Amino acid sequence: MDQEPVGGVERGEAVAASGAAAAAAFGESAGQMSNERGFENVELGVIGKKKKVPRRVIHFVSGETMEEYSTDEDEVDGLEKKDVLPTVDPTKLTWGPYLWFYMLRAATSTLSVCDFLGEKIASVLGISTPKYQYAIDEYYRMKKEEEEEEEENRMSEEAEKQYQQNKLQTDSIVQTDQPETVISSSFVNVNFEMEGDSEVIMESKQNPVSVPP
């Protein structure tokens, strides 16, 4: 009688342990799935928003520009160099390195300010324009003048052709109208001559000439 409760307790503990193990396994699998989904979402968001910035912009004499982008190797090298360079705490330096550190910082800041101001002054004075810009402008100006001259010549030729065609048309119209006027005048003259002859004949009939015996 005493062995049956002990066996029931052991069975209950075994069932509880198996249930806890199953719940733990299910929780781990669910956590892994959620982590994977979250990682995928984050990766897609980063890919969609990532924009590559050019490392430097090269300006040519002709006025054209070319953007140079860094490769993956350059980015890795830059990260390694940043990791290698140690951070300096000026408060922990002695007097010599402390003064040297601030002298270098002042020199670099002064050079950067001079570079910025020099670039602005050069752009205001027009020094930053390309070396042969005047030759390029002159070439485009001459090309524009040639195109305008060709356009004027073409328009004058078209106007002259149109004038010649109109002149030929008017001449042909005059030539077709002129024979009709000549024919009508000839008819008038003939009729006039016929009428004159009839009048002479009538007068001769009315006034007979007396013949001497």
Curated annotation (Swiss-Prot):
This is Protein FAM177A1. Residues 136-173 form a coiled coil. Signal peptide: none annotated. It holds the Pfam family FAM177. The modification N-acetylmethionine is found at residue 1. Residues 147-175 are annotated as: Disordered. Belongs to the FAM177 family. The modification Phosphothreonine is found at residue 71. Residues 162-175 have a biased composition (Polar residues). Keywords: Acetylation, Coiled coil, Phosphoprotein. InterPro entries: FAM177. The modification Phosphoserine is found at residue 70.
